[in-house]
Amino acid sequence: MARVTVQDAVEKIGNRFDLILTAARRARQLQLNQSAPLVPEDNDKPTVIALREIEKGLINQDIMDAQEFQKMAKVQETEEAAVALITE
C-alpha cells in the first residue's frame, strides 16, 4: 500500500476540503483515461497518483478548469463545423 502524506498537498491547495474535491476530480479523470498521469504511476491507484500530482504542484483546480474549458471549446468548434457542413 502506498503511503502518502497529504500535508504538502493541503498547503498547495489551501484547505483539506478543496484538496478532497480536487483529488477526487483528478482521480476520476485518471480512472476514466480522460487524461494521462503527470507523475510515474508506480502501480498506484488513481487517488494516490492525483495526490502526488497535487503535491508536486502539477495539478490544481484552476489548471483542471482551464483544461476542461479547452476541451469544451474544441467540442463546440467541432459541432459548429458539423452544423455548417449540414446547412450548406
UniProtKB/Swiss-Prot annotation:
BP term (GO), one: DNA-templated transcription initiation
Any single Gene Ontology cellular-component annotation: cytosolic DNA-directed RNA polymerase complex
Superkingdom field: Bacteria
Gene Ontology molecular function, alphabetical: bacterial-type RNA polymerase core enzyme binding; DNA binding; DNA-directed RNA polymerase activity
Keywords for the protein's UniProt record, in alphabetical order: DNA-directed RNA polymerase, Nucleotidyltransferase, Transcription, Transferase
Keyword Nucleotidyltransferase carried by entry: yes
EC annotation from Swiss-Prot or TrEMBL: 2.7.7.6
Enzyme class: transferase
Function noted in UniProt: Promotes RNA polymerase assembly. Latches the N- and C-terminal regions of the beta' subunit thereby facilitating its interaction with the beta and alpha subunits.
Entry's family note: Belongs to the RNA polymerase subunit omega family.
Subunit structure: The RNAP catalytic core consists of 2 alpha, 1 beta, 1 beta' and 1 omega subunit. When a sigma factor is associated with the core the holoenzyme is formed, which can initiate transcription.
Protein's UniProt name: DNA-directed RNA polymerase subunit omega
Organism: Haemophilus influenzae (strain ATCC 51907 / DSM 11121 / KW20 / Rd)
Gene behind the chain: rpoZ
